[in-house]
Amino acid sequence: MEWFESQGGGIYFPIGHSPHSDFIAEFGDRLARVQVKTCIAFRHQRWQVTICTRGGNQSWSGLVKHFDPARCDYMFVVVGDGRRWCIPSAAISGGRGIALGGPKYSEFEVEPGRPLPDPHGEEPASTIDLPNARGDVRVAKGTRL
């Protein structure tokens, strides 16, 4: 969203259930439905972005919803190192996934942003020092709960 605002766009959020777009960007008299994807999977020198949906936060029924370019106008992708792409939906080939970082979608790469947090990274230990630790679970388990 920050990138769209930096380009002069207004940002609007759909109210209620909106399975096909995450937000609406307004540029003058034009509205664009935007779907956002994040990716930390880096294999074979490319970011392997999954663009299909496999249930989300609901219990998975086994049905895969493939990407359909008619459902949104742009796909905005942020990858682990902060690189970003704003890809017109019509330019996306494939319904399950795309590989970014090579020549195919390079014309749609925009300015990088902040890197994504490392989901496997170690958090620093707590520096909380309680004077009366009796009965505190940290006495047995340490500072990492």
Roles of regions detected by a PLM:
Residues 1-26:
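A short acidic/basic microdomain associated with nuclease active sites
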Residues 4, 23-25, 30-40:
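Conserved catalytic cores of phosphodiester-cleaving nucleases, focusing on short active-site segments
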Residues 13-14, 35, 86:
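A structural signal for short, well-ordered beta-strand segments and their strand-loop junctions
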Residues 18-20, 29-33, 69-72, 80:
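Short connector loops at helix/strand junctions that flank enzyme active sites
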Residues 37-84:
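Catalytic cores of nucleic-acid endonucleases
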Residues 70-107:
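Domain-level recognition of nuclease-like catalytic cores that cleave nucleotide substrates
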Residues 95-133:
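Phosphate-handling catalytic interfaces
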Residues 138-144:
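Short, positively charged low-complexity motifs
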